[in-house]
Amino acid sequence: MPPKSGRAELRACLVCSILQSTNDFLTQGCPNCEDILEMRGSAERVAECTSLLYDGMIAMIEPSESWVARWQRIDKRMRGIYAVRVTGRAPQDVIDAIEARGGVYRPRDAVED
């Protein structure tokens, strides 16, 4: 859950767009993407795989039942607070890992290459 002190401390995951504090990413990793991102314990990796620049917030309580979750492609993700749009791209090694597992990396900034 987001810290009580507000938005200024939140970072967004560049893969799934979940919002957490820097400390939460550092101590717990990403609840959706940790097996690929491996942020837990690495401040450098948290900085590479998350962004302070994002627009909008979505409180997702029942992702599997939400049209907003389907629209944002987070309907199979954990409950939490998500950004609508995140500025930045995941590192190439992350994109390669997603593709090696048969997935497709979809940037969260809504900008087409």
Swiss-Prot record:
Alphabetized PANTHER family for the sequence: SUPPRESSOR OF TY 4 (PTHR12882), TRANSCRIPTION ELONGATION FACTOR SPT4 (PTHR12882:SF1)
Subunit structure comment from the entry: Component of the SPT4-SPT5 complex. Interacts with RNA polymerase II.
Name of the protein in its database record: Transcription elongation factor SPT4
Entry annotated with the keyword Nucleus: yes
SMART domains in alphabetical order: Spt4 (SM01389)
Zinc finger residue ranges, C4-type: 13-33
Record-level GO cellular component terms: chromosome, centromeric region; DSIF complex
GO molecular function, one term: zinc ion binding
SUPFAM superfamilies: RNA polymerase subunits
GO biological process: mRNA processing; regulation of DNA-templated transcription; transcription elongation by RNA polymerase II; transcription elongation-coupled chromatin remodeling
Domain of life assignment: Eukaryota
Keywords: Centromere, Chromosome, Metal-binding, mRNA processing, Nucleus, Transcription, Zinc, Zinc-finger
Described function: The SPT4-SPT5 complex mediates both activation and inhibition of transcription elongation, and plays a role in pre-mRNA processing. This complex seems to be important for the stability of the RNA polymerase II elongation machinery on the chromatin template but not for the inherent ability of this machinery to translocate down the gene.
Stored CDD domains: Spt4
Pfam families tied to this protein: Spt4
Localization: Nucleus; Chromosome, Centromere
Membership in a protein family: Belongs to the SPT4 family.
InterPro entries from the UniProt entry: RPABC4/Spt4 (IPR029040), Spt4 (IPR009287), Spt4/RpoE2_Znf (IPR022800), Spt4_sf (IPR038510)
Keyword Transcription regulation attributed: no
